Amino acid sequence: MSYLFTSESVSEGHPDKVADQISDALLDQFLAYDSHARTAIESFVTTGQVVIMGEVRSEVYIDLQTIARKTINKIGYTKADYQFDGNSCGILTAIHEQSEDINRGVDRQDEDEQGAGDQGMMFGYATNETDNYMPVSLDLAHLIMRTLADIRKEGKVMTYLRPDAKSQVTVEYSDDGHPQRIVTIVVSTQHDDFDADENRMLAKIKDDVKNILMPRVKAQLGEKELKLFKGEIDYKVNPTGKFVIGGPHGDTGLTGRKIIVDTYGGKGAHGGGAFSGKDSSKVDRSAAYAARYVAKNMVAAGVADEMLVQVSYAIGVAEPINIYVNTYGKSHVNMTDGEIAKVVGEMFDLRPKAIERMLKLRQPMYFETAAYGHMGRKNEVVEKTFTSHYHPTKTMQVELFTWEKLDRVDEIRRVFGL
């Protein structure tokens, strides 16, 4: 019997994502001027107020307030009407130095033996149901949100849009786990109060979502995803009606509260650790990226149609405690999942410092991850410029989403005889 599966995404203007982007913008600023910086930065946003908290170990001083304000304005919170804007919000900072007890457990004379920054288990997942090896429900939900933000920033149509928005996509799967069609698309978007007649205002937004937003979304899809737009799709647009009050004024935002949006939309598994604001010594982040890198390359190589990879650590210990693989019965090699996991451990060095080197995680590459998902994104090199009241302006080439590279596929095929 067929079944339905749902994933959601949120816009860069969602309050939790505002907090994530502030945390990662600050991380990037530290890394731009001190590639060895260690950070664990949490941000909190509410009506007219930002609180920045956490632990940092760095040789440089960063103007936290300036970076936070620039980030908020870049997202689109620039008007006093929003009750939260980058120019006028209050900003309270409470940053202190990282615990020496943690430093002693992580630092080693031989940096290859750098210990994990914490205990925990991390997961990576990949499926061949889309070209970027992501669940189709999440991939489409992200694309809807990115496209809506593009329309808002262009300011040519749907000029009533405000930054906060959410999407949700439900997909029907066949008995054997293949996506068949899109069943429901939910879009909730914040908007100006542009018509005294609420029914007419809602009708306009619904019409624009169907006739402006969705055609632009479809124009960006590959053949696999376009085939799913068949039959009657139930569009639910702003189901509560009016959505004028939103963003941090409507709901308090906090770093790390959208961990399923950030990863696989409910597919696979999640170890519970958030990403934003954390440098790569924190395996919550770096090992989750490495596990995605392993899973994606393994699926792309044809080892399985779908794969979940778990890796776990003890604080202060470099070697992983375990590596686990689940191919969901979709393996194409004559090996058990346990045997596949053993080969993964032999092929991939998953010690924290090795992961940093393998994925080039000491670059200021994190702001771009903080909205629209950390996984399934485009690996590319971009030029980024960092300015500071305390340091010279710095322009550098930064490689983004290194864990999305498919540079181990040929090696994996040789090892597995594919």
Question: Language-model segments: which ranges?
Answer:
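N-terminal, positively charged regions that mediate nucleic acid binding
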Residues: 1-40, 155, 409, 415
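Glycine-rich, mobile lid/loop segments that gate access to catalytic sites or pores
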Residues: 6, 66, 73-245, 371, ...
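Conserved phosphate/anionic-ligand binding catalytic regions in large, soluble enzymes, centered on
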Residues: 8-10, 14-19, 115-130, 244-269, ...
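Alpha-helical support elements that line or immediately flank enzyme active sites
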Residues: 12-31, 129-148, 278-302
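A short glycine-rich, hydrophobically flanked beta-strand micro-motif that places a catalytic Asp/Glu
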Residues: 37-41, 165-171, 233-237, 303-314
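Short, charge-patterned binding micro-sites
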Residues: 40-58, 315-319
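Internal helix-turn-beta structural module
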Residues: 46, 306, 313-418
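Glycine-rich anion/phosphate-binding loop at the beta-strand->alpha-helix junction
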Residues: 196-300
